[in-house]
């Protein structure tokens, strides 16, 4: 059986640009792209924390260290500059692979500068 597990997440990034007339995609600061282990043109899910919108697109590289998170093309209709978003990608793997796998989790500040990384999410308690 193949399972779909979270591969990578950039948590609560701030949308810095929204370019309706640019070729579709989400441009992500190259530093964040690399830290998350995301590839250019990889399918990503975007979850808008600010308004609840959810959509998929593909990642492209923005300037390294720029803090750019730019939602482009038709997807720009789902965000506004200043919105908080989560960028996530999933990977297919066997149960054996899943048993030893851990995702790349990237956390950023309000300027999209990386604050820290992790490979697990703390257990939620009541």
Swiss-Prot record:
Gene field: panD
HAMAP family from the UniProt entry: PanD (MF_00446)
GO MF terms held by the record: aspartate 1-decarboxylase activity
Gene Ontology annotations of biological process type: alanine biosynthetic process; pantothenate biosynthetic process
Known catalytic reactions: L-aspartate + H(+) = beta-alanine + CO2
Chain residues that bind substrate: 57, 73-75
Family: Belongs to the PanD family.
Active site, renumbered: 25 (schiff-base intermediate with substrate), 58 (proton donor)
Record pathway: Cofactor biosynthesis; (R)-pantothenate biosynthesis; beta-alanine from L-aspartate: step 1/1
Oligomeric form and interacting partners: Heterooctamer of four alpha and four beta subunits.
Function: Catalyzes the pyruvoyl-dependent decarboxylation of aspartate to produce beta-alanine.
Matches recorded under PANTHER family: ASPARTATE 1-DECARBOXYLASE
Name of the protein: Aspartate 1-decarboxylase
Record's cofactor remark: Binds 1 pyruvoyl group covalently per subunit.
Gene3D superfamilies per UniProt: 2.40.40.20
């Amino acid at each position: 059986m193949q399972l779909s597990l979270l591969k990578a997440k950039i948590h609560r990034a701030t949308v810095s640009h929204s370019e309706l007339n640019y070729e579709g995609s989400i441009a992500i600061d190259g530093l964040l792209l690399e830290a998350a282990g995301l590839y250019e043109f990889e399918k990503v899910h975007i979850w808008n924390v600010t308004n609840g919108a959810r959509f998929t697109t593909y990642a492209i590289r923005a300037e390294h260290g720029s803090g750019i998170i730019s939602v482009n093309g038709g997807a720009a209709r789902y965000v506004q500059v200043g919105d908080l978003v989560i960028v996530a990608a999933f990977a297919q793997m066997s149960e054996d692979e899943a048993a030893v796998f851990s995702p790349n989790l990237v956390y950023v500040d309000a300027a999209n500068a990386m604050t820290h990384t992790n490979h697990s999410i703390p257990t939620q308690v009541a």
